[in-house]
Amino acid sequence: MRINPTTSGPRVSTLGKKFQGRIAQIIGPVLXVAFSTGKMPNIYNSLVVXGRDTAGQEINVTCEVQQLLGNNRVRAVAMSATDGLTRGMEVIDTGAPLSVPVGGATLGRIFNVLGEPVDNLGPVDTRTTSPIHRSAPAFTQLDTKLSIFETGIKVVDLLAPYRRGGKIGLFGGAGVGKTVLIMELINNIAKAHGGVSVFGGVGERTREGNDLYMEMKESGVINEENIAESKVALVYGQMNEPPGARMRVGLTALTMAEYFRDVNEQDVLLFIDNIFRFVQAGSEVSALLGRMPSAVGYQPTLSTEMGSLQERITSTKEGSITSIQAVYVPADDLTDPAPATTFAHLDATTVLSRGLAAKGIYPAVDPLDSTSTMLQPRIVGEEHYETAQRVKQTLQRYKELQDIIAILGLDELSEEDRLTVARARKIERFLSQPFFVAEVFTGSPGKYVGLAETIRGFQLILSGELDSFPEQAFYLVGNIDEATAKAMNLEVESKLKK
């Protein structure tokens, strides 16, 4: 692993005077810096402005070179606020791209875009660092085998399975269980795959980032007593950050994930919330740099920027990075260039439904709207495919009958339709599941359900063998044996009441 100079702390002052330039112009978060002839920095090099403002406060602003303007000038985008900077201030070229700490030292900690800890838990070991700008793995390194990434969550594994090293779009509004689903996936990958997770908060609310951190500590995903046993590293670039930080924070998180994949040879889960904010920040930077806008005001390099991030998220022969990306769709317009460009990269979509959340069915994953390219007989096998299709058909028929039931009632349906409705309601409830990370709130122990068990359970419901069981027996259980046991208990309880 190449060790690069870090862009913060006392080490910067040791860089030779030959790397120095001066601020020539400041336009918001964009700086034009003049260097002497022959000392020009490269594109993506990290520059540091160190000095004092007019009030005597110390300034340490890191920038990234974006354009070489000619006349020995470069244009750079600041990664933090440019308050207090003045023309003529000294700028130091670090001679390398922005580098961030990687490895086990990052687990359980919160970082900003520069790889600096922001959780008040002391310094982080920076002996091993990695540059945030890297090329995607070569074709010869890629693992092209199509394999399912088992999550232990029934509705996901059966109806919209994730691909190992794939990219999943997570669509969900506020309060439908997105955070809990994210935390459960982080927990399950750590237990079942011995993997770790990296969470990149791109342009999200500071409050949401804080809530996620607190909930992770409460559920044990972050171990406060022994921080090294934590299962996740967090990287935040919130809404209040300059566009440069929001544009690069996704790369910082990805760089940390790549180290776990390439060096530790682990399966890594990378969460990006929200991928739209990455595009939005890129659009702001593009406008500040004076580029001609493209369709709907987006940057002309939209596809290139998205591609350079997404192509690094992949499986290699060493390990895999499976990415789950929250996708905001502006004005619910799926043809908007930002979501449209994102969809081109996704292998699966997990849609969270407010209707299911209102019924108390968690995880509130919509079984009919969620899709996956992996749900093909040649990949998942005939048995899995047939079971998934029959489950979807049953739920679709139930959806079609709901209007009739609402107007005329259940008694007006044919015998066959009544049976379909009864089975669909059992399936709907069996798609719910108690989560490990929700134990502290619900009091019921979490369940990890293997794919074979999931398929067996739904086959039994579809075959009609469990038609005599009450539908509440299928609610918030793990495998089908638990539902059977619950049905027996309910029967005993009802007899005792009589």
Swiss-Prot record:
Localization: Plastid, Chloroplast thylakoid membrane
EC top class, in one word? translocase
Q: Which terms does the UniProt entry file under GO BP?
A: proton motive force-driven mitochondrial ATP synthesis
In terms of NCBIfam families, this protein maps to:
atpD
General function of this protein: Produces ATP from ADP in the presence of a proton gradient across the membrane. The catalytic sites are hosted primarily by the beta subunits.
Family, similarity comment: Belongs to the ATPase alpha/beta chains family.
Q: What is this protein called?
A: ATP synthase subunit beta, chloroplastic
Name the source organism: Nymphaea odorata
